[in-house]
Amino acid sequence: MFKYKGLTFIALSFILLTTLVATAIPLLAQYYIDNYITKNIATAGLYILAGYYGLFILRVVFTFIGEYYFSKVAHSIVRDLREESFSNLQKLGMSYFDKTPVGSIVSRLTNDTQAVADMFGTIFSSFLNSVLMFVVTLTAMVSLSWQLTILMILFIPIMLGSVYLYQRLSSRLVEITRAKLSDLNTKLSESIEGMRIVQAFNQEKRLLDEFEGVNKEHLRYMSKSLAVDSLLLRPAMALFKILAYGVILAYFGLSWQTAGFTAGLIYAFIQYTNQLFNPLIELMQNFSVLQTSMISAGRVFELIDNTEYEPKQSNSDYKIEEGNIEFKNVSFSYDSKQDVLKNISFNVNKGETIAFVGSTGSGKSSIINLFLRFYEFERGKIFIDGVDIKDYSTKELRDKIGLVLQDPFLYHGTVESNIRMYNDNLTENDIEEAARFVDADNFIQELPDKYQSKVTERGSTFSSGQRQLITFARTIAAEPKILILDEATANIDSETEETIQRSLEKMRKGRTTIAIAHRLSTIQDANCIYVLDKGEIIESGTHEQLLEHKGTYYKMYQLQAGMMQ
């Protein structure tokens, strides 16, 4: 907030002016009543009356300006929070995303940051206005009748006790309600992202029932919060105000003749009592919003302060020139309890291709995750060109290692921007050459706007083969020394596979390649194939050697060959 001290100063200034004007209104009304109305010379007091309404107009104008600038500060703060949260999100390692639902992250970046904005824009300004109004009004009341002011002050501890009771009852409910809202967002996110599967397997009814269950849970706790609010907020405060009015009227009724109270003074004191209690009532009404905002702020700052960063790399000047790879006795566990990789060792020379095969959960993807430095490992060593992989800079690893995933991901934009990936060093000719190299140029040229054709979210308007070819072009445009192929042909139909395989062969030429294979037919020309089982290498050799061995690889090959027939 101090970052916007100029805007904050303007907002505070107008809040102070609003308070002073609000305090002056009852005094002017008292003067008008006692000096003009009670003396039957109301006509002469028209100027006073005009001033009275003028103060009301000033109060409205000052209130608007103060709230406008506070809202401006609030929206600037929420912008900064979202940028800071998203910036830190980019630095977090895969372990954070493994255990945190996407919907929960989205909820923190949208709903929770907006709740923080509400706190600064509405609650904070209301709090300052209430405190100033309380202090100035109390001073004015003392000047009118210090005895009655003391009686009014006696109500304050009772009201504060009500605030404390409300806080004790509602804080836990608010926290649970926000958690249920996060669950709701998570369920929505999962449902929308997996809509193809939902419809394909006729799961709409089950999904609707699950969503209704989560939604009802959210409603249940929201209803409990509203019940507490309805009991301890407006009704309780209204009761205290009525009791205070009764005390005022009784006091003036019993002592007006001896104390010399005037009608104007009585009117002013009632108005000031209103102004004294209204800030407390407003604070109570905003307390539930404040609690929600505080819990949301905690969730946002939990994300900002999260330090589960991706593994740190050295800032050295080491360069990947050849692409020789060595894994030496590497073991790894995601949960520090059960190893998913056990004593993995292998070598890949420049320009060679190796492949990993095995059942689901055998450790294939874990090897890739460690090599790409998505996770930190402590046992064993990984070398590139004889240099420990931890000694390379992150930029060097990202620049020299190209990744092609099983599920190609395209971003909203154009075909060109998806190949370029915001690398300004690439020219249009570089992009087209990369596309031609992987045989993507043919279908791109047939698009209405060619390389400027629009790409929707995840590239849903393209076939899986077309999406894969675009990601191939993206990888080749970066000119990597090492290629990682994570089951790049697993989701491709047989007709498209021929084009994909031809492109992959050209991509692999002269580059060190590590492939995870689902279809054994795609890696028969690999220099070495490693068979994994429960995190261990149980077989290795060329395609022919492994078939002759008639072990696990042979059985896998026979099974796939039988399925093909």
Regions found by a protein language model. Name each.
Residues 1-22, 37-48, 66-70, 74, ...:
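Membrane-integrated ABC transporters
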Residues 3-6, 94-95, 111-120, 124, ...:
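An intracellular "coupling" helix at the cytosolic face of ABC transporter transmembrane type-1 domains
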Residues 8-62, 69, 142-147, 259-263:
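Transmembrane helix-loop-helix hairpins at lipid-water interfaces of multipass membrane proteins
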Residues 13, 21-25, 62, 110-155, ...:
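Hydrophobic alpha-helical transmembrane segments of ABC transporter permease domains
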Residues 40-48, 140-154, 228-298, 303-304:
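Helix-loop-helix
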Residues 55-74, 121, 125-132, 153-177, ...:
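Alpha-helical transmembrane segments of multi-pass membrane proteins
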Residues 75, 83-107, 111-113, 186-210, ...:
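Short intracellular "coupling" helices and adjacent cytoplasmic loop segments at the cytosolic face
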Residues 246, 312, 318-565:
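ABC-type nucleotide-binding domain
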